Regions:
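Active-site-proximal loop->helix
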Residues: 86-104, 124-126
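Conserved phosphate-binding/catalytic loop of the ribokinase/pfkB sugar-kinase fold
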Residues: 78, 109-114, 122-171
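Conserved beta-alpha-beta core of the PfkB/ribokinase-like small-molecule kinase fold
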Residues: 161-263, 288-291
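A glycine-rich helix N-cap at a beta->alpha junction
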Residues: 97-117
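Glycine-rich phosphate/adenosyl-contacting loop at the front of the ribokinase-like
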Residues: 1-79, 96-99, 103, 316-319, ...
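Hydrophobic beta-strand scaffold residues
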Residues: 76, 108, 195-196
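Conserved phosphate-binding/catalytic region of the ribokinase-like
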Residues: 1-11, 17, 186-190, 206, ...
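Cofactor-binding loop segments of dinucleotide-utilizing enzymes, especially the Rossmann-like FAD-
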Residues: 10, 80-84, 113, 126-128, ...
Length: 401
């Protein structure tokens, strides 16, 4: 039996502690940055394992998506690099990441154990109140992601959907100006998979960069990639950074948010759609839903369409920070209706609403039960297809129980 969804790259263990002030010093308060692996603090494996045991760790990257998709009933595998170590063959971070995903029904058979580099690790300075702490990401083994190794995973598992996380966070994965990743995605399509890639460039102050029109070099990696992918959704802030890099000149502050999102999707479609007879779906996530624009195999274009979430439930304030879980819902829907997607007859609004539902449910989940709000696909679909506007989160949870 083939795998439904194969998620690739960026295995990372996220560690959150109030005494990680060094993260602020590295990346600034509230900043996010990919740091050099050699600059990672020299904590012992025993210390990292102790923090993990004490509950200060969560599984990031595919840990934000794979368990959510699997809980709906789809068969999910993950292909990642993990560091070698003394915890049943893995380092402490890798053993934690591996065990979390395995415990949630994920096929981890396509793990590559890197002999020299540690598992990706993020240190997050947890703070109280409105001040955000720094987030310092050390890629470790993720930087040496070899597509030739993971072509074997695609050939063995024959996935219906391939999801690569993330463009912009792996030195080897992003090599050759992004053309290596673009060729790999094209190869995956040639092997029968529908493809989605997420970009993730860690910048400390996106709003200042947007206003200044600054180009972010990592977004140039999307130039060869976007014609090859079948689905691509980004946040409203990243959308502006992407266009500032690939087609500078727009004065974003002179227009409203709706006009900017419509403009960006028109730009993406015009620039990156190819007349090759396949469905393409581009989108932008916003605080209360998402915009989508799609091109059907017959070359008809629909959108941009604004799809407001029906699952804010009076309590979810902002969906923008839930991009991974949104994509998990979108992927779940598209994979469950893959023939319709390929034919261009899928209900694109329902697909986006499934993403909205996943995002709301994930945002409200406690850290100790991050995946517990996601249920079997038929229950999730029933809620998506209902006409109910839920007045409270409890009411929404009851509808899914």
């Amino acid at each position: 039996m083939s795998t439904d969804v194969l998620i690739l790259n960026t295995a990372v263990t996220d560690l959150r502690r109030p005494d990680f002030e060094f993260a602020d010093e590295l990346v600034g308060k509230g900043g996010l940055a990919k740091c050099r692996t050699e600059d990672m603090p020299d904590y012992s494996q025993q210390q990292l394992a102790e923090w993990i045991e004490q509950g200060f760790a969560t599984a990031g990257g595919p840990g934000n998506t794979a368990p959510l998709i699997a809980r709906t009933g789809l068969k999910v595998a993950v292909g990642v690099n993990l560091g070698r170590g003394d915890y049943d063959g893995l380092d402490a971070q890798g053993r934690f990441f591996h065990d979390v995903l395995t415990a949630n029904g994920i096929d981890m058979s396509q793990t590559y154990i890197h002999p020299d580099l540690h598992t990706g690790t993020t240190f997050i300075h947890s703070t109280i109140g409105q001040d955000r702490g720094g987030i310092a990401y050390f890629p470790g083994a993720n930087d040496d992601y070899d597509f030739e190794i993971f072509k074997g995973a695609v050939e063995r598992l024959r996935p219906r959907m391939v999801y690569y996380m993330y463009s912009g966070l792996s030195d080897r994965g992003d090599a050759n100006g992004g053309r290596d990743l673009a060729e790999f995605i094209k190869w995956c399509r040639g092997n029968g998979a529908v493809t989605i890639v997420d970009s993730h460039t860690l910048t400390g102050n996106p709003h200042a960069l947007i206003e200044q029109g600054v180009a972010v070099k990592e977004y140039r990696l999307l130039e060869p990639l976007l014609p090859e992918v079948d689905l691509f959704f980004t946040s409203c802030d990243e959308a502006r950074l992407i266009e500032n890099t690939l087609a500078p000149g727009r004065k974003w502050i002179e227009f409203g948010e709706h006009e900017n999102n419509v403009h960006f999707l028109d730009f993406l479609t015009e620039r990156f759609w190819r007349k090759d007879g396949r469905t393409k779906l581009f989108g932008v996530t916003v605080s209360d839903g998402a915009y989508e624009q799609h091109v059907n195999p017959d070359e008809t274009v629909d959108g941009p369409n604004r799809i407001e979430s029906r699952f804010m439930a009076g309590e979810v304030v902002d969906l923008v920070g839930a991009g991974d879980s949104f994509r998990a819902g979108l992927i779940t829907y598209v994979t469950s209706h893959l023939d319709e997607f390929k034919a261009g007859s899928i209900d694109f609004t329902e697909a986006v609403q499934m993403g909205n539902l996943f995002a709301s449910m994930f945002i409200k989940a406690p850290l100790e039960d991050r995946y517990g709000n996601i249920h079997a696909y038929d229950k999730m679909l029933k809620v998506v297809r209902s006409d109910v506007t839920y007045q409270s989160f409890d009411e929404l949870q009851d509808a899914l129980s």
